[in-house]
UniProtKB/Swiss-Prot annotation:
Pfam families: RuvC. CDD domains: RuvC. One of its GO terms (cellular component) is cytoplasm. GO terms for biological process: DNA recombination; DNA repair. It catalyses: Endonucleolytic cleavage at a junction such as a reciprocal single-stranded crossover between two homologous DNA duplexes (Holliday junction). Mg(2+) 1 binds at residues 8, 139. The gene is ruvC. This is Crossover junction endodeoxyribonuclease RuvC. The lineage of its organism: Bacteria, Pseudomonadati, Pseudomonadota, Gammaproteobacteria, Pseudomonadales. Its cofactor is Mg(2+). InterPro entries: RNaseH-like_sf, RNaseH_sf, X-over_junc_endoDNase_Mg_BS, X-over_junc_endoDNase_RuvC. Keywords: Cytoplasm, DNA damage, DNA recombination, DNA repair, DNA-binding, Endonuclease, Hydrolase, Magnesium, Metal-binding, Nuclease.
Length: 174
């Protein structure tokens, strides 16, 4: 059984989700949000790093999936998102986690069956797949979806011996 951490990065709210991959499916372990407030960017990035590090210490995942940066209309927002993502990746790398990156389309395809699914469709599928009785907060739901996507990709790669085949600096590029 493998514990998987999913991260939905953000400069103000970073969602996290932890699932246990049993080999026959995934079980919910934990989820939540790291709220950084509205202070200086450097302090918000430190809060992302510290928060992700604390989640890793608390739950002990061995691998992490994180969403790739998408091109936003606002270049400044995309840059800040990329920096928050970097802080989360460094926290995972510091802890020795294997890290994989997924596009939003890959996550939606893996969870809802279509890359065009909206956040509510993904949230409902996360609830169904993990047998949750209540809706998780949307950022936590997205992080759980990333963890489930990572579990799905890990299962499809293991029989072919591809896990770790394209590792660079601790990150698995798919």
């Amino acid at each position: 059984m493998t514990l998987i951490l999913g991260i939905d990065p953000g400069s103000r709210i970073t969602g996290y989700g932890v699932v246990r991959d049993t080999g026959r499916g995934c079980e919910y372990v934990a989820s939540g949000c790291i709220r950084t407030g509205s202070g200086e960017l450097s302090e918000r990035l430190r809060a992302v790093f510290s928060g992700v590090s604390e989640v890793i210490r608390t739950y002990g995942p061995v691998t992490m999936g994180i969403e790739q940066v998408f091109m936003a209309r606002n270049a400044d927002s995309a840059l800040k998102l990329g920096q928050a993502r970097g802080a989360a990746i460094v926290a995972g790398a510091e802890a020795g986690l294997q890290i994989a990156e997924y596009t939003a389309t890959q996550v939606k395809q893996a969870i809802a069956g279509t890359g065009g699914a909206d956040k509510q469709q993904v949230q409902m599928m996360v609830m169904h797949l993990l047998k949750l009785l209540e809706k998780p907060q949307i950022d936590a739901s997205d992080a759980l979806a990333i963890a489930l996507c990572h579990a799905h990709h890990r299962q499809s790669l293991v029989p072919h011996g591809l896990i770790g085949a394209k590792r660079r600096g601790g990150r698995l590029r798919l």
